C-alpha cells in the first residue's frame, strides 16, 4: 500500500463523515468510506429512503444514517468531515462556513485526490474548450507511453483510482468552477482556456465565478507550469496569479513564450527559451473549427517538454473530436446534421457557428443560466439562415436577435418548437440539399434533460430515425 493511500485511510477511519447528495461518485465513495471505518451520514433533499430507488437497499445494508427533507443540512452538525458535491451551490453561505468555523473539514472527492495523489497532475479549466483540451492532453501522454488517469469533470471519479496510481503515472483532470471554488491545492500543470460569463444562476456574481477559476493557479508549487489563453482578457489577467513558469496559447498573435498559429504558413508552433518549433500544419488538423485550433495549442503548450513532439503530431493529425462537439450525425436528402449539444453558452455556440463556411439552420434554446445573449445576436444574424428556438431561453435569444441592427426577418425566419422532436421537424422542413442543421443551444439542458449528453443523444436518435 502506498503511503498516500495510507494517509487517506488514517484521515477517514473512525470519523463522522457527511455526504451531500448521492450522485454517482458519492455512491462509490460512501461504500469505500464505510468499509474504511467511517460513520457516514447522507444529507439529501429526498424525503424518505424509498425515494433513493435501487440505492435504498445499499443505504440500509451499509447502515448509513440519513438527514433528509427540507432540513437535510442539519446533518452537518457534529461531523468531522463534510464531503461536498460540485452540484451543491452556496459554498460561502451558511451552513458550510458555520461547520468550518466549528472545526469540521469541508472537502470533496477531487480535493482529496489532489491532496493524496502520488503522481503529477495536469488540470484544465475554463468556460469553453475544457473537455477537448483535457482529452487531447490525455491522448498526448498515452501516445508517449505514459499511464493516464483521466477524471474530474470528465470520465470517472478519481479518488477510487488512488490505489492504482503510481508515482510515474500522470493524472489529467478537468475542473469546473463548482469543483474549484473550495480547492486549496493546484496541479503541477494548470491550463485556463478562457473565462466568459457562465453558471451565473449558481454563482453569486461573475467575480465569484472568476475567483473559483483562479484557484487552479493560486496554490501551485515550484516546479510548475501555467498555460493561459492570450486572446481572453480574463485568463490573460491571471498571469499575476502564476507561481512558476507561465506560457501563452494564442491563435491570433505571435508569441515568444508559448504555442501559437504562425500566420505566414499556418503552422502550429511552440516558442520557448528563444526557440520556435513548428510542430503541425493547420491543414493536417482533423478537428473542425478555429476554436479547436486554440484547444490544440493549449494542450500542446501544457505537455511541451513532457512528451515527444511526435506524440503531439500523431494525436493532432488524427484526433477527430469528442461526442457532442460539432459531431457529424448523418446526411439525409443532402442535408448534413451536426450535434453540438455542448453549446451550453453563447461563446460555445458562436465557436460552432464559425466552424462552417456557409449559413446554417440553427436549433437553440434551453435552460436559463442568466447569462447575456446580446453577444450571440450578431453571430446568429451573420451565420444562420433559419433559427429554431425552444426552451426557457428561446424568447430571450429571439429578443436579442431581433434587436440586432442587421437583423432582417425576410433573411432570417425565427420559429419556436415545443420540444426536440418538433425542433428537428421544423428545421428539416426549411432545409434544402446542401444545407447544414446544427443543434447548438447556447443554453444548458436542465429544463428538459438531466445534462447536455442526454440532450445530444436524443437529438441524434431523432435525426437517425428520420425517414
Each predicted region: which residue ranges?
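Nucleotide phosphate-binding/pyrophosphate-handling subdomain across enzymes
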Residues: 3, 8-16, 26-36, 147, ...
Amino acid at each position: 500500500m502506498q503511503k498516500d493511500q495510507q494517509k487517506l485511510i488514517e484521515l477517514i477511519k473512525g470519523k463522522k463523515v457527511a455526504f451531500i447528495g448521492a450522485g454517482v461518485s458519492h455512491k462509490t465513495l460512501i461504500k469505500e468510506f464505510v468499509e474504511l471505518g467511517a460513520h457516514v451520514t447522507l444529507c439529501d433533499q429526498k424525503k424518505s429512503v424509498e425515494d433513493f430507488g435501487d440505492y435504498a437497499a445499499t443505504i440500509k445494508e451499509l447502515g448509513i444514517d440519513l438527514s433528509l427533507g427540507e432540513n437535510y443540512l442539519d446533518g452537518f452538525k457534529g461531523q468531522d468531515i463534510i464531503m461536498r458535491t460540485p452540484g451543491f451551490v452556496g459554498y460561502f453561505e451558511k451552513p458550510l462556513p458555520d461547520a468550518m468555523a466549528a472545526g469540521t473539514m469541508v472537502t470533496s472527492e477531487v480535493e482529496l485526490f489532489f491532496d493524496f495523489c502520488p503522481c503529477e497532475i495536469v488540470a484544465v479549466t475554463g468556460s469553453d474548450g475544457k473537455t477537448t483540451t483535457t482529452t487531447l492532453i490525455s491522448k498526448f501522454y498515452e501516445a508517449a507511453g505514459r499511464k493516464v488517469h483521466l477524471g474530474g469533470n470528465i470520465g470517472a471519479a478519481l479518488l477510487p483510482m488512488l490505489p492504482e496510481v503510481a508515482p510515474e503515472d500522470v493524472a489529467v483532470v478537468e475542473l469546473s468552477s463548482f469543483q474549484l471554488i473550495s480547492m486549496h491545492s493546484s496541479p503541477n500543470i494548470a491550463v485556463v482556456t478562457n473565462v466568459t460569463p457562465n453558471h451565473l444562476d449558481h454563482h453569486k456574481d461573475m467575480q465569484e465565478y472568476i475567483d473559483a477559476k483562479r484557484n487552479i493557479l493560486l496554490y501551485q508549487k515550484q516546479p510548475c507550469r501555467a498555460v493561459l489563453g492570450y486572446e481572453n482578457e480574463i485568463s490573460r489577467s491571471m498571469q499575476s496569479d502564476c507561481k512558476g513558469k507561465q506560457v501563452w496559447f494564442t491563435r491570433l498573435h505571435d508569441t515568444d513564450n508559448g504555442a501559437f498559429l504562425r500566420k505566414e504558413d499556418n503552422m502550429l508552433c511552440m516558442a520557448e527559451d528563444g526557440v520556435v518549433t513548428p510542430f503541425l500544419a493547420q491543414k493536417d488538423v482533423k478537428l473542425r473549427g478555429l476554436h479547436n485550433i486554440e484547444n490544440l495549442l493549449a494542450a500542446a503548450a501544457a505537455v511541451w517538454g513532457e512528451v515527444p513532439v511526435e506524440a503531439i503530431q500523431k494525436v493532432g493529425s488524427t484526433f477527430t473530436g469528442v461526442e457532442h462537439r460539432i459531431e457529424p450525425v448523418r446526411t439525409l436528402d443532402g442535408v448534413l446534421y451536426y450535434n453540438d449539444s455542448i453549446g451550453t453558452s453563447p461563446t460555445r455556440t458562436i465557436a460552432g457557428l464559425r466552424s462552417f463556411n456557409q449559413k446554417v439552420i440553427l436549433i437553440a434554446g434551453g435552460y436559463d443560466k442568466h447569462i447575456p445573449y446580446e453577444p450571440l445576436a450578431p453571430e446568429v444574424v451573420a451565420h444562420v439562415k433559419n433559427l429554431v428556438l425552444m426552451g426557457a431561453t428561446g424568447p430571450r435569444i429571439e429578443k436579442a436577435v431581433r434587436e440586432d441592427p442587421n437583423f432582417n426577418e425576410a433573411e432570417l425566419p425565427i420559429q419556436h418548437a415545443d420540444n426536440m422532436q418538433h425542433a428537428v421537424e421544423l428545421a428539416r422542413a426549411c432545409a434544402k440539399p446542401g444545407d447544414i442543421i446544427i443543434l447548438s443551444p447556447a443554453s444548458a439542458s436542465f429544463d428538459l434533460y438531466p445534462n447536455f449528453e442526454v440532450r445530444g443523444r436524443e437529438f441524434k436518435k431523432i435525426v437517425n430515425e428520420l425517414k
